[in-house]
Amino acid sequence: GDTFDLGDVTIEVIHTPGHTRGHSIFLVPEAKTVYLGDIELTGFGPYYGDAWSSLIDFEKSLELCRNIDAENFVTFHHKWVITGRADFINQLDNFEKVINDREEKMLDFLKKPRTLDDCVAHRFVYRPHVELAFADSVERRCAEQHLNRMIQDGRVQSAEHKRFVSI
């Protein structure tokens, strides 16, 4: 990525796609500080529900973040500043675990054949009572990404009538 030289300080731009195609984080090596943007470490977990989001890219970006040499980690939402690498790694682990949790819940739900619409209605990202205009489209994009991966991994298969079932 690019590096901005501001005199006594440099800012390194590190491309971390997943949340969006162009998502980047900004490392200030002299301050051992990284601005994580929308890698926000909340209990909601990674958001990869936009049209240009990618679950696979997000996971690669989280691995990249795990290896950044920093002591201060600044998020865009809710957490703000996390001081100390051990605390950051713990929060990153919890944040990343949400992906696995969603997938495990989906596998359990797919013990009976279900359609994509069934998965959307069940809500694996948002809680069932959350009424947001965009919630169904986010659920659909996230479910499609998980289903595609689980089909490729052999954990889910297509069934009749456009249904999916866990193996």
Tell where the protein language model's regions lie, with residue ranges.
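Conserved hydrophobic "DFG−1" position in protein kinase catalytic cores
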Residues: L6, F26-V28, S158, S166
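C-terminal regulatory/interaction regions
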Residues: K105-I167
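Alpha-helix-centered segments that form part of catalytic cores
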Residues: G1-V9
